[in-house]
């Protein structure tokens, strides 16, 4: 299970921490207004028409893989959240509110882990939790 702890909501973005099996993997940023509601989701690798490769798409509750389109939320590389649409989440190393670096590197690493799980036919769960910076463990 992947958990994203949202720590800070600012006008520059929603800053979070992505954790797998209790270990911090990377930071996340989302658009300050167009982000997914906190809750449980699944992740599936899907070919999207406007992308050159399969992307880790975030499936909403009850959504089937064949219902995914170009406007589906996904995990992706990037630098800042202002161009994000549809609830997409950028991965990377946080340097300021709404800004990450080394995004492609963190994205590729996470995708490799997710692909291995997918090949084993494991269901990839995503839980998004809204926590303030005072609530999240110092370890993250």
Explain the meaning of each model-derived region.
Residues 1-125, 129-136, 140:
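Cell wall/extracellular polymer interaction/catalysis modules
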């Amino acid at each position: 299970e992947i958990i994203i702890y949202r720590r800070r909501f600012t006008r520059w973005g929603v800053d979070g921490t992505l954790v797998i099996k209790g270990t911090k993997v990377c930071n996340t940023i989302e658009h300050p207004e167009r982000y997914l509601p906190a809750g449980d989701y699944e992740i599936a690798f899907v070919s999207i028409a406007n992308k050159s490769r399969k992307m880790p798409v975030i499936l909403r509750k009850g959504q089937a893989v064949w219902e995914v389109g170009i406007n589906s939320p996904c995990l992706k590389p990037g630098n800042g959240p202002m161009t994000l649409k549809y609830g997409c989440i950028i991965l990377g190393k946080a340097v300021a509110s709404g800004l990450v670096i080394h995004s492609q590197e963190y994205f590729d690493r996470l995708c490799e882990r997710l692909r291995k799980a997918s090949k084993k036919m494991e269901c990839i769960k995503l839980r998004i939790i809204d926590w303030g910076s005072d609530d999240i463990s110092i370890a993250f």
